[in-house]
Amino acid sequence: MALLIAVASYGQTAKQVLDKAAAAVSNKSGITASFTLKGGQMNDKGSISIKGKKFQIKTSNVIIWFDGKTQWSYVRKNDEVNVSTPNESQLQALNPCNFIYMYKKGYNSTMAKKGGNYEVHLTSTDKKKSVQEMYILIHPQTYIPSEIRIKHSKGWNTIEVSNVKKANLSDEIFHFNSKDFPTAEVIDLR
């Protein structure tokens, strides 16, 4: 009952809020943001650039490029690049903004108010999915997500998102350029 009142007071459904968040984050020319990842053994800070389904993630440990099909992961300490073609669950684990696509199929959604923001709760309809549950805090005026909490088989991860800006991103930044890493060993896992 309280959830129905909360949703009614917004005048929007969880899906409508997620549609607006997806539109805000999937700017055709691209966006950039900073993030902090916390949970389990994965604690790191970094930046992300997104353009459609393409992304580039930079942290102190790795740089990941994804051009919509191929992924390159550069591991700094090993000076190596792993090349792969990730599946849906691997992409969900890597890209904090992947909820843009995943909420449309295979998830039930509800919404409540938390600290003046929309809090959308997604639960998987398929017990085999790698992401079983997710909470997304969304700003009510900009529809930009500020926090994403994801439940994996090993527990919860929290991604805090900040400094989200529209950007005119070249497709080149979503590809690994071997000239920038001349000593890196390239390992093709495809």
Please name every model-derived segment.
Residues 32-34, 72, 121, 160:
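Soluble periplasmic/extracytoplasmic beta-strand elements of cell-envelope proteins
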Residues 2-43, 49, 54, 79, ...:
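N-terminal leader/targeting segments and the immediate start of mature chains
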Residues 50-53, 65-67, 134-147:
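A short, surface-exposed beta-strand/turn
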Residues 34-37, 56-60, 119-127, 147-151:
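Short beta-strand segments that buttress and anchor functional surface loops
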Residues 45-94, 152-158:
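An acidic-aromatic
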Residues 114-117, 125-133, 140-190:
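Non-transmembrane domains of secretory- and envelope-associated proteins
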Residues 86-116:
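Flexible, surface-exposed loop/linker segments and immediately adjacent secondary-structure boundaries
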